[in-house]
C-alpha cells in the first residue's frame, strides 16, 4: 500500500489541510493519506499549542468521513525531538509492506536541504509537493529530482495561526473549519485567551 504522510501540528486542523489531503488521496499515486500529528516540542514555548491528544482528536473528527485519510499519532511514541528520517525508518520497520512518501508544501521543499539526513529521505522515499504562495526563490535542483512529484493541487492560503487569532478576537471563522472541529473548539473554549 502506498501511504502519503502529511505532517503538521494541526493547531487546529482546517479545511485547507483537508483540501490538500483529499486532493493527494484522489489525484496522486497514493492509496491513503496519514495525517501525522507532530508532538509538542518541549524546548519550544507552548503558548497557544493545544495538548497533543486534543490536536489528535480534532484530526480524528475532521477525517472520520474520509475513507482514504487517516489520523496518525506515530510521532507521539518516538523520542523527541522528532526527525522525519527517524519516523520514516520506524514506519518502514513497523509496516514493511507499505511504501511511505512525504507530502509537503513548496515552501518546505525549499528548506529540505536543511533537514537531518535529507539525502536518505530522497533516496528512499517519494515526495509529493503541493503549491504554496511564496517570495522565496524556487529550489530548481530539488524540484527536478526524480523522487519529487509536483502535484497541481489547489493553492489554499489558510493558516492555523490566522484561525487561532481570529477566534481570540471573537471572529466567526466557522467556514474555515470542519463542522465537528468547530464544535469541539467552541465547546472547549480553545484559543479564546
From Swiss-Prot:
The keyword Oxidoreductase does not apply. GO terms for molecular function: ATP binding; nicotinate-nucleotide adenylyltransferase activity. SUPFAM superfamilies: Nucleotidylyl transferase. GO terms for biological process: NAD biosynthetic process. Transmembrane segments: none annotated. InterPro entries: Cyt_trans-like, NadD/NMNAT, Rossmann-like_a/b/a_fold. It is an enzyme of class 2 (transferase). Coiled coil: none annotated. Keywords: ATP-binding, NAD, Nucleotide-binding, Nucleotidyltransferase, Pyridine nucleotide biosynthesis, Transferase. Gene3D superfamilies: HUPs. Pathway: Cofactor biosynthesis; NAD(+) biosynthesis; deamido-NAD(+) from nicotinate D-ribonucleotide: step 1/1. Its EC number is 2.7.7.18. It catalyses: nicotinate beta-D-ribonucleotide + ATP + H(+) = deamido-NAD(+) + diphosphate. HAMAP family: NaMN_adenylyltr. Belongs to the NadD family. NCBIfam families: cyt_tran_rel (TIGR00125), nicotinate (nicotinamide) nucleotide adenylyltransferase (TIGR00482). Catalyzes the reversible adenylation of nicotinate mononucleotide (NaMN) to nicotinic acid adenine dinucleotide (NaAD). This is Probable nicotinate-nucleotide adenylyltransferase. The gene is nadD.
Amino acid at each position: 500500500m502506498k501511504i502519503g504522510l502529511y505532517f503538521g501540528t494541526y493547531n487546529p486542523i482546517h479545511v485547507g489541510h483537508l483540501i490538500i489531503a483529499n486532493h493527494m488521496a484522489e489525484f496522486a499515486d497514493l492509496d491513503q493519506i496519514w495525517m501525522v500529528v507532530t508532538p509538542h516540542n518541549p524546548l519550544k514555548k507552548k503558548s497557544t499549542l493545544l495538548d497533543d491528544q486534543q490536536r489528535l482528536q480534532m484530526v480524528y473528527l475532521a477525517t472520520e468521513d474520509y475513507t482514504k485519510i487517516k489520523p496518525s499519532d506515530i510521532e507521539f511514541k518516538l523520542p523527541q525531538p522528532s526527525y522525519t528520517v527517524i519516523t520514516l525508518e520506524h514506519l518502514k520497520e513497523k509496516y514493511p509492506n507499505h511504501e511511505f512518501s512525504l507530502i509537503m508544501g513548496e515552501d518546505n521543499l525549499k528548506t529540505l536541504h536543511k533537514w537531518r539526513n535529507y539525502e536518505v529521505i530522497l533516496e528512499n522515499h517519494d515526495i509529493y509537493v503541493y503549491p504554496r504562495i511564496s517570495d522565496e526563490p524556487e529550489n530548481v535542483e530539488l524540484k527536478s529530482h526524480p523522487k519529487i512529484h509536483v502535484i497541481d493541487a489547489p493553492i489554499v492560503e489558510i493558516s492555523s495561526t490566522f484561525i487561532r487569532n481570529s477566534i481570540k478576537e471573537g471572529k466567526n471563522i466557522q467556514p474555515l473549519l470542519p463542522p465537528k472541529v468547530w464544535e469541539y473548539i467552541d465547546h472547549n473554549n480553545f484559543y479564546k485567551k
